[in-house]
């Protein structure tokens, strides 16, 4: 058969059509992929994956993280800061079990605060758990909370028979029991009231050590006693988170190698109900720390081991021996509960005792307690200036407004205290009347003052159904002792580190002079980033919670630019007309946002 020879130009046409087909197919493929990514969950998933890759890179590459911080500070980061992974819903940076498990077990060092450097931390916003709801309002929250807000069933499963808490439909309920009082904290407190003046205002501040879900502290509120409960992050998962969700004052802490972050002679009552603190270990170091914190004339209550406990005769004998060495008065031993009263005046500590206890010399500051190693010496009452014993300070509520002697011993302390009280009465009235801040609302229960000084802001709220965590920055004058003498509570803290609480635990955060919290004392330079501080504030603030910041117009303009990045809506207002200075007031509200479904 013959062959037809086509011209060269004709022979090339099939190849040209094949190339055109490829280009056309590629174009339609790109269009199809665009619509898939835009309108299907696959696109969301890939976008989320990309965001998380970027998020992880900010932690692994400090330079990229710093670039992002700089953009946010300048208001040039147009999108909100990315959300953290779903598994971070209960994340506490300084109490991270994965990080801390590598540390020494000696004296529970690994369960204390150990904070990562900012450059080691992803810059992201902690999400709420799936199904999160605005918390049950106070006082109903004392007895029930939403299960979805903290879907951790371990305590209810293990401790339900002891009356700690139960799962009932959408709620966790709190019958008010505990390991040492399964019949309810009310009955237990009635027993203590036979020996301790729980009524009448003699006792005001209490510390509940190893508190469970804080039913003891919650019940004491009806007696006018303000108990701060603490426990470490532990195997029960989120004891303190449950306490705070209920609206009970609480704080994450561990009595390990360091002093607890409170000044000397803060508490009128200290309580341990099966807290399992080995008070006599390490030459009674932990009992000595309790003694530092307990006000002279105050009461120490220990229920549970080793008090008349089977097979713990030696531990019980040692506990009694330490109390005798410190001249504590034995008030009662009632079953497995012992009650002691601390002596007033100079310690009668003998020169010879079986634990080798000695008085601290004058070089040991009694109230320094920020990363301060525990001392194996007993605080001298004479080393703490002012009147601070029960019986010499006023009863509650008079002590709230009377000038504490520990304020008077400061330079110009009397005048400064009285001026501070007037200033905050005026400011809070302006907040309520002119700025319409509803501080008496049932939705506001847990309040924080990040820069409390003498506690003037908290004092004006004393008649409201709120409690205030007064924070004294560790690098500022240590005035927390004055706050406790007033019958209020608080802690020392450095705001260049995360706070020891769970996410979403405060309804209202107040700060006067936010930039001063991160500035170096000897220069105008910052010790850390305002962006990181605002991300931390967002972590501990509940959705729909409010932030009030007082500072200069320049600082507040900067904060307002960053507020968008942490998903807050904000507005700036003039200060009250009676106040001097240039400061203004920023009010911000945290939005309730949720993770995309593909992020779980």
UniProtKB/Swiss-Prot annotation:
Associated pathway: Glycan metabolism; pectin biosynthesis
Superkingdom of the source species: Eukaryota
Chain ranges on the Lumenal side, renumbered to this chain: 40-600
Membrane topology: Single-pass type II membrane protein
Disruption phenotype: In seedlings, no altered phenotypes or changes in pectin methylation. In contrast, suspension-cultured cells exhibit less pectin methylation as well as altered composition and assembly of cell wall polysaccharides.
Parts of the chain on the Cytoplasmic side: 1-18
Keyword Methyltransferase among UniProt keywords: yes
Tissue note: Highly expressed and abundant in suspension-cultured cells, but low levels in seedlings.
Stored SUPFAM superfamilies: S-adenosyl-L-methionine-dependent methyltransferases
Subcellular localization, as worded in the UniProt entry: Golgi apparatus membrane
Keyword Methyltransferase attached: yes
Positions glycosylated per UniProt: 283
GO biological process: cell wall biogenesis; cell wall pectin metabolic process; methylation; pectin biosynthetic process
EC numbers for this chain: 2.1.1.-
UniProt-recorded Gene Ontology molecular function terms: S-adenosylmethionine-dependent methyltransferase activity
Keywords for the protein's UniProt record, in alphabetical order: Glycoprotein, Golgi apparatus, Membrane, Methyltransferase, Signal-anchor, Transferase, Transmembrane, Transmembrane helix
GO cellular component: endosome; Golgi apparatus; Golgi membrane; Golgi trans cisterna; membrane; mitochondrion; trans-Golgi network
Transmembrane segments annotated in the record for this chain: 19-39
Purpose: S-adenosyl-L-methionine (SAM)-dependent methyltransferase (MTase) which mediates the methylesterification of the pectin homogalacturonan (HG) and thus regulates cell wall biosynthesis, at least in suspension-cultured cells.
Homology family: Belongs to the methyltransferase superfamily.
Record-given protein name: Probable pectin methyltransferase QUA3
Organism in which the protein naturally occurs: Arabidopsis thaliana
Lineage: Eukaryota, Viridiplantae, Streptophyta, Embryophyta, Tracheophyta
